[in-house]
Each structure stands twice: as structure tokens, then as C-alpha cells.
């Protein structure tokens, strides 16, 4: 059989992989397709297959012999890995389109998952070719397909959100990149990612959080383990800037900008959006002021906000109107008396320092309740006894 002959020839050419080829041949002859699939997953992860056309040859000479007998989503996984070894994107797309046709020919009931997985990879190749329009079309069609399906494998979602994030990254649509990249991580084990990949993604996520419109809550990102990839690197400063934003700490932010001026200047997007960043941290400083005040003290003098943000009263009013317009807070701005009454603030993911502050407020409230109780007991003993 041609498949076995191929394995034998490869074993002779690469004796160091002899045990691998023997195992593949044994499972193939016994038609243990599930076990063969698992062994292939391990095999193609070996370093010898990470360059050249070795994977393409393995697919064409071995996997094609039984490709529709294995789990079709696993076949899609293999096909996508193989496609990345084609030096020309057009050849890779043509190969993947051929696999899709084979999937359709099986007439299996669950072919939408593997087809969606492969089409998403085609969208990425189109994006890498500079064809944003075709990439967007494939992604839109893919979303409609996913929305119509149930019980979807996490790898299909992960692949879709990853390619979507890359589309928005190319277009510098920071908020959309941020949303899709976090969704990608929701369906992906961080431990399965390489250190270099984690560092690059953590860096991109951090920048998009800072630059994205209407992103004012950094707690979710700071709590994600991928952000630890920034620590101990030459971009650790970005992690500390995120913390400063999360705490609304204008003083710390300005100090970090001074210390890491060279690194910040090397990021064109940060330089171009310097004013927006300052406005955002001032808004977050305002939010921090609101959350740090007792629940019964919802009226805040504009002078208090001006002192913390180092802004004029006029600029504070503008800051409040911006916060009201993006629905970070609800309330009434009283320009005559120079106050703002805040009736509601957008919920947020709290960090440890913010939780500690909340605990301190709760402790203070408990003390007040206890004092009130003692006062009532002392003044109306008969009523309490009754």
C-alpha cells in the first residue's frame, strides 16, 4: 500500500524517527483511527515538522488515505497546520478549499464545525495578502454560521475570535481587537501558548485597552494570567501603566511617563493619542473618587475633583459631561453650586486594593450601625426589652 510504503521510506530516511513511523504504521494497519489521530497530533508537533514541506508530504502521502475516516474536526486541525507550510498563500488557500470540498462530499451531519474552522484560516490568509474586504466577508459569513450552530468545539470559537482580532488589529480598531482577543483567550488554555506568543498578545491587549474607545475597566485584563507575561521584560512599564489607569492614579501615570519616556515615544499610537490617554485617566480618577466616597455622600464638590485631577473647574465640567455621555455614571451636574450628584456608577472588576477600600467602607458602616444600636438601647431600654 502506498501509505505504508511512504512511512517505510521516511523511516529509512529518518532512522531517529523510526519508532514514530512504526507506531503510525501499526495503528494504520489495525484501523485504529482515533488512536492514530492522537499519535499524529503528537507527531506533527515535533520540531522536524516546523519547517520545510515535511508536513505537506505527510498529508499528501499518508493522511489523505484515511482523512475522512477520522474525526472531521481533527482533520480540519491537521489541514490548517499543513496549510501554514505552503510558501505561497494562494497555494495554501487552494489546498484548504480542496479539503472543504472533501468534507462536503462526506455528507456527514456535523461538517459545519470543520468547514468553519478551515474557512476562518482562509480569512487569515486573505488578510495577510492585504485583502481585508474578502477577510471581512468570510468572517461575517462565519459568524452567521456559528450563530446557527449549537454545542460548538472551543477550538472553532478560538480560531474565529483570533482571526477576528487580527482583522481589527490591522485596521487599528482597538476596542474591537480588545473584545475579540479576550474572547479568543476565553476559549484557549494560556498554558498551551508559547512564551513569545503570550508576550506579544499581552502587549497588544494592553495597548488596545489604553487606546480603545469606551474601555474604562481594566480589572478583567489585569486579572488575566496572560498579563504576567509582561513582567520581567523590557515592556514591563506597560503593565504598571495599566495599573495606574485601573486605580485612576494620575500622579503614578505621570511619573511612569517621565521614567519610561523613551519607551513610550517608541510607540506611535501612544504618542498620537496622548491627549486621549490623559482624558481617560482623568475619567478613571473621577470614577475612583466616586467609589471611594461613602454611599450616603453622593454629592461631590467640583473643587475636590479639580484638586485630584489637576484640572480647572471648566475642564472638570467637561470631564463629567464626557463620563455622563458614555454612561460611566448617572447623575446631575449643578454648575451653579459647583457640585455633581452621582446616583449610579458603572460596575467594574475590582483589584485587591479596591476590594480592600470597599472592605474598609463596609467596616465603617458596621461600626456606625453598632454605635446606633448602642444609642437606641441606651435611650429606649423598655422598648428594646419589649
From Swiss-Prot:
Entry-linked SMART domains: PINT
Q: Which GO terms describe its biological process?
A: protein catabolic process
Keywords for this protein: Acetylation, Proteasome
InterPro entries assigned to the protein according to its UniProt record, in alphabetical order: PCI_dom, PSD13_N, PSMD13, WH_DNA-bd_sf
Q: Which cysteine-cysteine pairs are annotated as disulfide bonds in the entry?
A: none
Residues forming the PCI domain are 174-347
Carrying N-acetylalanine, the residues are 2
Q: SUPFAM superfamilies under this entry?
A: Winged helix' DNA-binding domain
Instruction: Cite a GO CC annotation.
Output: cytosol
Q: In which tissues is it expressed?
A: Ubiquitous with highest expression in flowers.
Pfam families according to UniProt? PCI, PSD13_N
In which domain of life is the source organism classified? Answer: Eukaryota
Q: Which PROSITE patterns match?
A: PCI
The job of this chain, per UniProt, is described as: Acts as a regulatory subunit of the 26S proteasome which is involved in the ATP-dependent degradation of ubiquitinated proteins.
Quaternary structure, from the entry: Component of the 19S regulatory particle (RP/PA700) lid subcomplex of the 26S proteasome. The 26S proteasome is composed of a core protease (CP), known as the 20S proteasome, capped at one or both ends by the 19S regulatory particle (RP/PA700). The RP/PA700 complex is composed of at least 17 different subunits in two subcomplexes, the base and the lid, which form the portions proximal and distal to the 20S proteolytic core, respectively.
The family this protein is said to belong to: Belongs to the proteasome subunit S11 family.
Full protein name: 26S proteasome non-ATPase regulatory subunit 13 homolog B
